[in-house]
Amino acid sequence: MKLVMRNRRLFHAGLWCRRAGWLTSAISLLCAIALFLSWHQDEVVLRQEAMAITENLNTDSARIHAVNNWVYHNKGFASNDRYFILPALGPTPIQVMERGGDCSDKSRLVAAMLNSIGIHAGLVMISPCLDCGFIHTVVEAQYENRRMVVDPIWNIDYPTGDGGFLGVMDLAGTSRGRERIVELQHQRPATDKIASIPEMDAMFDYAVAMNWKKNIVTQTAVFILRLNGYQPEFFFRPRLLEDPKLLLAIMLTIITIIAAIGGYLLEIGLRFVMMRIPRRMTCSNADKLGATDG
């Protein structure tokens, strides 16, 4: 009788584990779908605005320049304190479009708008030294099989003089960034914002798209990537890291999968325990009977 009751409790526990897993999975999935739809609506707005800005332009470099120029003139430059659900994730690109922001906020908007029209772009963080903290953020975007840097806080790009533009790797270890600042300061009025730009904002010696030294996880990822022949320093910063809605939607999708599989595995584990208990009891009873007969 005790064995039957124990098996019954284990059976119901397994059933509840599965149901709890499915319920958690269903809730997470619904939230993920809602977030994805909200992100998609934002994406439509960004794409429409970016297409309007670049309507008559024929090259990606011209489109990148135009979007950067538009974001520079859109709203103010104070840090955007808005956020979506989690303050640590910062504002969404739409929130930056509505209220402006600092270098990281406006760079987030530029990258999102460029990605929405099919131009690969990502944020790049600038540091004054190898072990120093990050002091500025810009955007690096791909154009005609090359890359170019744009800065939506100072409205800067870095032309080569022959129709091309410079990317992070082209600017690193050179004085081209500082030379470009001096050039623009002479071209623009003395009252222009660029008159107050810190020199370090245009130095790319320690600029990175990802802080690969952040922790053991990122360091391991770098090791694995290099082991497989990849060069992480050439990767664009993942888009989901700069879009809170997209990041949360993906995280909830992962939770959905884990909850569904986890509940099912717990039920299987409890059933396995149920199958083991009768065998042990049978063996124990057989030993007792053998001893009695003896």
Q: Language model features by range: what are they?
A:
Residues A32-G101:
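Secondary-structure boundary elements
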Residues K2-F11, R19-W22, V139, Y143-R147, ...:
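Short flexible/disordered coil segments
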Residues I156-Y158, D162-F234:
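Extracytoplasmic/lumenal ectodomains and periplasmic regions of secretory and membrane proteins
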Residues S104:
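Soluble catalytic regions of membrane-associated enzymes that act on cell-envelope
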Residues K2-C17, I216-A249, I277:
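Membrane-proximal basic amphipathic "stem/tether" segments
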Residues M1-I53, D293:
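Linear, non-domain "peripheral" regions
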Residues R108-V182:
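Hydrophobic/aromatic-rich core segments of domains that either
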Residues G21-A34, E233-G294:
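C-terminal single-pass membrane-anchor helix
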